[in-house]
Amino acid sequence: MIIWNPWHGCHKISEGCEHCYMYFLDRKRGIDTAKVFKTGNFDMPLQRKRDGSYKYPSGMEMYVGLSTDFFVEEADVWRDEAWRIIKARPDMVFRLLTKRAHRIEKCLPKDWGDGYENVLLSVTTENQKRADERLPILLELPAKHKGFMAAPLIGPIEVSCYLATGQIEDVLCGGENYDGARPCHYEWAKSLSEQCKKYQVSFNFIETGTCFVKDGKTYMIHDKQVQSK
């Protein structure tokens, strides 16, 4: 997984943020996650090797903003430049993830039209409340590619009505990590997987999280490699 964080930092806005892994990691490093700043890796997709070729070659996927939210308010002053970088690499795929679905439309670039071919817009759906809040907004937006991430999955979600539209092409799912991690139940992930299968939507379960419940048993899993298996 290639991650591009053009800026760092965010504000907690919903239940999925309660035990945010970035707040945990930043706290260990003495960083205030609530302070949003532009990173030194802002131009990462455009970086080149000594021979002049791109450091990140054609065909790669970049997950954008995993230490922030691409649509966080403080980044409004930098986002147009980030859009220009994204547009300059039509040979790559950029996966933009947000909990701020309500801000997407007004933050799109002027030449967005019906979407950039190399951008997948994705919202977080940690529980039913947020799925019902964010997915209708996503479905109303113009975009060539749409998806959602049920992580941290902290409750069962029924999303068949959204998958049935045919607009959602990619779903990721996973549990919560680090201090205070809430349980992720196997049955919740299995249900979501079956819903995606019914509507032929790509589904990937990326990790169990620290606290995973299956068949009535609770497993505390601290090894990230074990989680992803």
Regions flagged by a language model, labelled:
Residues M1-H8, R29, I154, V159-K229:
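Auxiliary Fe-S-binding modules of radical SAM enzymes
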Residues M1-S14, E18-V119, Q128-A131, I157-I168, ...:
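Conserved Radical SAM active-site core
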Residues S67-D69, K99-A101, T124-Q128, A151-L153, ...:
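Active-site beta-loop-alpha junctions enriched in small/polar residues
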Residues W78-I85, R134-I137, W188-L192:
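A general structural detector for well-ordered alpha-helical segments in enzyme core domains, enriched
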Residues N118, S122-E126, V226-K229:
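Acidic, His- and aromatic-enriched active-site or binding-groove loops in soluble protein domains
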